[in-house]
Amino acid sequence: RAGKKLLAAKNLMTDPEQAKKFVHLTGVDSLGVAVGTLHGPMKIFKRLPKIDFERLSDIHKKVKIPLVLHGGSGVPVADLKKAAKFGVAVVNIDTELRLAYLAALRWELARQKKEYDPRVIFAPVVKALTVVVEEKLRALQN
C-alpha cells in the first residue's frame, strides 16, 4: 500500500521532460515546480516537506530558467540553500509568515493589554515577520 502512495506522489511531481517542453512552447521566464513541497498549514503539523533534489536538479538542467518553489513553508533552511543551487529563485512561504504574524500578534496583545495604539502593538509583529523573511533571503543568496 505504501508503494502505491509513493507512486501516486511521484506522478504528481513535475516531469523534467514535460517541463522542458512547456518552457520551450510557452517562453515563460520562470517555472513553478512540484518537487515534494506542500501548500497550506496542515503540512507543518504532519511532516516536513521533503524535496526531491534529483528531480529538481534534472529540471534545472533542462529548463535553464529560474524555478519557483510553492509550499515553501516549513522547508529547512539547509534545504532552501541546496534548492537555490538547483535554480530555485522564488520560495513561497505564506503559511510560515501567517503563523509568525499570529504568534507575534497574540503575544503582544497578551503582553500589552492596556495598549491602544496599533503602531506600538504592531512594531514587534512586523519585526517577527522581518526575521522570517531575512532568514529565507539569506538562505537563497547564491
Question: Where are these predicted regions, by residue range?
Answer:
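Alpha/beta enzyme core
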Residues: R1-V63, V77-V88, L99, A103-W107, ...
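Flexible, active-site-adjacent loop/turn segments at secondary-structure boundaries
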Residues: V33, G40, S73, T95, ...
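Extended, intrinsically disordered, low-complexity segments
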Residues: E108-N142
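Glycine- and other small-residue-rich loops at beta-strand/loop junctions that grip anionic moieties
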Residues: A8-N11, I44-L48, L69-G72, D94, ...
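Hydrophobic faces of well-ordered beta-strands that scaffold small-molecule active sites
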Residues: L31-V33, L67-G71, A89-I93
